[in-house]
Amino acid sequence: MEATSSALSSTANLVKTIVGAGTLAIPYSFKSDGVLVGVILTLLAAVTSGLGLFVLSKCSKTLINPRNSSFFTLCMLTYPTLAPIFDLAMIVQCFGVGLSYLVLIGDLFPGLFGGERNYWIIASAVIIIPLCLVKKLDQLKYSSILGLFALAYISILVFSHFVFELGKGELTNILRNDICWWKIHDFKGLLSTFSIIIFAFTGSMNLFPMINELKDNSMENITFVINNSISLSTALFLIVGLSGYLTFGNETLGNLMLNYDPNSIWIVIGKFCLGSMLILSFPLLFHPLRIAVNNVIIWIEITYGGANPEEDPQVSEYTRASNLRPISMTVEDPAQPSDALDATSYNEQECLLPNGNFDNGSIESQENNNDERGTMAVAGDNEHHAPFVKSRFYWITALLLISMYTLALSVQSFALVLSFVGATGSTSISFTLPGLLGYKLIGLDSLAIGKMIPPKDRFYKRCSLLLVFYGLSVMFLSLYVTVFNRSDEA
């Protein structure tokens, strides 16, 4: 698949993946945290999530062809037996959040235009289904840009309302009496809402498709996209979070739009923008969901179905990926003179070191009928995920959409389910898995050619290990808070 994506379109897609409807819940989190702690938590989430994206990008460069990067491929290089588990984490995360978007669409549009909740959920399929059928993430750039305009309007609305009320002197009492500038307002509330901010920057599910489709997928350009995306997302979260909290103080609600006058034309437009943003964000979650489901299906075929790699090209690609090893090795032929072997090894190393950079990958020894010595062949030119063949792309798409719409039409609240989704799925793909992959892969390129790991890579490996412990801590704390709150409600 030809790489056509620019840094601008990749930034738009990544920002739109990160920033969703949860933005309007951040002021509510600030109400419990206070201004100082809320800002610190936002910056902490930005740094840790950005580090996770950067580590994954570094891991992609350990492949001979970085355009083949995916969670699936890297897990097969490092933890083959755990690959299905991480795909399941991706499925849980994307399916759960996508489902919540459909539920919110059904709750939002009837208040704007009338009609039944279920009617609007079904009507959203007119836009969602065509966008879910595109095969390249870059083809969603225009819908992402439209979604960003909708998000920009909401952010400007929240900020301008704060400035307008401040100018009229309406906020004097709130700023003096309600706002906690330096201390935590509600410690129990902090534990209940901290996951809103921590998980706000989840966007790693679309990082690898972005890397694979970038025209210039150098580490510098990828870092540029990540830094811009995290910076823009952080700015939006802080603007909405602080402006919303400083405007309403202790009256701030979980959905900030409910704090405003529902009859105001500006608020009506804002709610319409929110609904549009939900519809346009759905395909960005569906894209990695479909890939993860395909990977799990093929793994089941191999493990329990007795599939034959020689007969099924999908199974063949999966099996080939599962046999990959991250360290390249040369193959010695006893009949070959040592000086010829040295020259061959040097030439092989040159092939594996484009532009002076070693890319880890699997090296398979193949027998050349025209040459007695072993030759090296690179395994890694397969798709960046287990490929879709024949009609599988379409029936996976159909089954997922039917199941998600059926659940959205039949159940109106997924609050508890989404709490567990955030605690497990988000932490796995944002912190734990990037940390595990980074600790295993970063620096292996230097070791493979007999060099010491550079100090910078050693630093990244330590950061990766810290990211694992950070992710596990966040996961267990989030699960504890979810169960604790549930027991209190009971």
From Swiss-Prot:
Membrane-crossing residue ranges in chain numbering: 7-27, 35-55, 85-105, 109-129, 144-164, 191-211, 222-242, 265-285, 398-418, 429-449, 464-484
Annotated source species: Saccharomyces cerevisiae (strain ATCC 204508 / S288c) (Baker's yeast)
GO cellular component: fungal-type vacuole; fungal-type vacuole membrane; plasma membrane; vacuolar membrane
All ranges on the Cytoplasmic side of the membrane: 1-6, 56-84, 130-143, 212-221, 286-397, 450-463
Pfam annotation, one family: Aa_trans
Additional comment: Present with 195 molecules/cell in log phase SD medium.
Name used for this protein in its record: Vacuolar amino acid transporter 7
Role description: Probable amino acid transporter of unknown specificity.
Cellular localization per UniProt: Vacuole membrane
